[in-house]
Design a protein with these regions (language model features):
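Acetyl-CoA-dependent GNAT
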Residues: 3-85, 89-91, 102-104, 108, ...
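A generic secondary-structure micro-motif detector
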Residues: 35, 95, 117-118
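A general structural signal for short secondary-structure boundary/capping elements
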Residues: 48-53, 105, 114-119, 130-132
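Conserved glycine-rich acetyl-CoA-binding loop
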Residues: 89-103, 112, 123-130, 134-135
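Tryptophan-centered motif/residue detector
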Residues: 108-109, 137
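C-terminal "cap" of GNAT-fold acetyltransferases
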Residues: 115-118, 122-126, 134-158
């Protein structure tokens, strides 16, 4: 299995929207609110691709699109990166790819000077929660901005 991590090419923007839409459904079990969520997404991606510290990555396995990452090496908390999206297409879930994706995030954030990563995950996304708990992520607190999600943290290996 040859895994390649490549910065998102905006010419492949439809892959970004497809990934975000499926991730939204995995998180919440419905598409209600997705149109509002995705509004302005292309502009945000373009802006962030040009901004240091942002990582918008497409994952390919043996040349086939397998998933998408969105994360940054800064947050309001010192030495802390924030993960906005870890997405794998359904046919790559359970394939052993997810731990390698986490290793990529950890390596990238560590090189950027982060000691910790934080993400917000839906309480109903049981598959993601199971993975996070098995791979070192710890519950931090409820997300005050979203009733259905909680913050988890991962201390990065140094």
């Amino acid at each position: 299995m040859e895994i390649t991590f490549q910065q998102i090419n905006i010419d492949n923007f439809e892959l970004c929207v497809t990934a975000r839409k499926d991730a939204y459904f995995c998180s919440f079990g419905h598409y209600d609110g997705f149109d509002d969520f995705i509004s302005g997404y292309r502009e945000r991606v373009l802006d962030r691709l040009a901004t240091s510290g942002w990582f918008y990555i497409h994952i390919f396995v043996d040349g086939q699109f397998a998933g998408q990452l969105e994360f940054r090496s800064f947050s309001p908390e010192p030495e802390t990166g924030y993960v906005h999206l870890i997405y794998l297409k359904p046919n790559f879930r359970g394939s052993g790819l997810a731990p390698k994706v986490q290793d990529y995030i950890v390596s990238t954030l560590s090189k950027a000077g982060c000691l910790r990563a934080v993400l917000s995950v839906s309480r109903t996304n049981h598959r993601a929660l199971t993975f996070y708990k098995r791979h070192g992520w710890e519950f931090v607190r409820n997300n005050p901005k979203h009733d259905e999600t909680d913050f988890y943290q991962l201390w990065l290996r140094t």
